[in-house]
Amino acid sequence: LQLYISKTDAYSEIGSFYGFGHQQAFLGYESYILEPDTNDDANTTYFSNLANCTFDQEYIYATRGYNGKITFNAAVQYEDNLFLGLNLNSHLLHYDRSTQLFEDNTNAGSLINNIDFQNTLATFGNGFSFQLGGILKVTHEFRLGLTYDSPIWYNIREETTQYVSTVDESNKRTIINPKIVNIYPTYRLQTPGKFTGSLAY
């Protein structure tokens, strides 16, 4: 007895076991954009069902998001000569990107005449940083300043979704919409830190 595996389940399992690249091959194969040279599991070569010639393409790219910061600060003064300040920062990051590619062709020999390929990416992150600075009044007229901006230590995770549809030479539409959210492992990102000095007289 052979169990039926839906395209949604297949897309999900391919992503879990083999990764993003294999999911792209799956979408191309199931939407008839690509065909394997041979129908066996060991095959690694494919050919396109679109004949070379002229293509009309439209590409839509949309982004939105925010990068926010919440700051807690404290300051102390020693006599009238030394001033110290500290900022503790909590960073929030959210970024959405959506892309859509439309492609049409009337090329002789093309089995596929229309492609609609959509991708979304959602990025979520939070981070921490601090600033520490001081001003030293050497004399009444002369001041030295030094500030350290720490790196921002981010924890970031990303999610993607995909959709593809094609129309073949007989005007039959094939839609591959897995409705699967690919959630990738959280990774860390660190921006550079810096020192800033100043003199005033």
Stretches with model-predicted labels:
Residues 1-201:
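Outer-membrane beta-barrel porins/channels
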